[in-house]
Amino acid sequence: MVRPLNCIVAVSQNMGIGKNGDLPWPPLRNEFKYFQRMTTTSSVEGKQNLVIMGRKTWFSIPEKNRPLKDRINIVLSRELKEPPRGAHFLAKSLDDALRLIEQPELASKVDMVWIVGGSSVYQEAMNQPGHLRLFVTRIMQEFESDTFFPEIDLGKYKLLPEYPGVLSEVQEEKGIKYKFEVYEKKD
């Protein structure tokens, strides 16, 4: 079974997603709660969601918050020989991770699959064939960044007018405005 992939990201107006291994903007508590809720909430009783992230993203998470709780965590790395402490699984590539998820012992436990970063993992996911959703928080300001989100090909991805559980009005925290968007492609 090929399940839909979901990418979730917060991105500044200049497409920045990271700076020095952290977010380019000050912590936005409600935006973080949205990330937690979306990636944790399973619609199937007895199943858990699964998050896939690159090695740098894993190590950018404060140690006390690793692994992301109530989710199965897969870390991608070509260099590491075993999963970093706290991670549930290690895979060499996104394709390897997706194959791993379809193994019987995992397939029966996993509900939604979420890609949580970084840039190259998002890029690889967005180029996958099939059903993909992008959950994008648009931070409506520019922030100095050293890591960026790939361009969304609007020929492939359609911005949905609304999505269950996603607020459509502009949010504001700490003087920073942002809005939630959901894009989808099916091919």
From Swiss-Prot:
DHFR domain residues: 4-185
Among the record's GO biological process terms, what is one? Answer: response to methotrexate
Residues holding NADP(+): 10, 16-22, 55-57, 77-79, 117-124
What pathway annotation does it carry?
Answer: Cofactor biosynthesis; tetrahydrofolate biosynthesis; 5,6,7,8-tetrahydrofolate from 7,8-dihydrofolate: step 1/1
- What is the top-level taxon of the source organism? Eukaryota
Recorded catalytic reaction(s): these are: (6S)-5,6,7,8-tetrahydrofolate + NADP(+) = 7,8-dihydrofolate + NADPH + H(+)
The principal location of this protein is: mitochondrion
Residue sites binding substrate per the record: 31-36, 65, 71
**One GO CC annotation:** cytoplasm
Any idea which UniProt keywords this protein has?
Answer: Acetylation, Cytoplasm, Methotrexate resistance, Mitochondrion, NADP, One-carbon metabolism, Oxidoreductase, RNA-binding
Q: Which family does it belong to?
A: Belongs to the dihydrofolate reductase family.
Q: Which PANTHER family match?
A: DIHYDROFOLATE REDUCTASE
- Subunit info? Homodimer.
The entry's protein name is Dihydrofolate reductase
UniProt source species? Mus musculus
Its gene is Dhfr
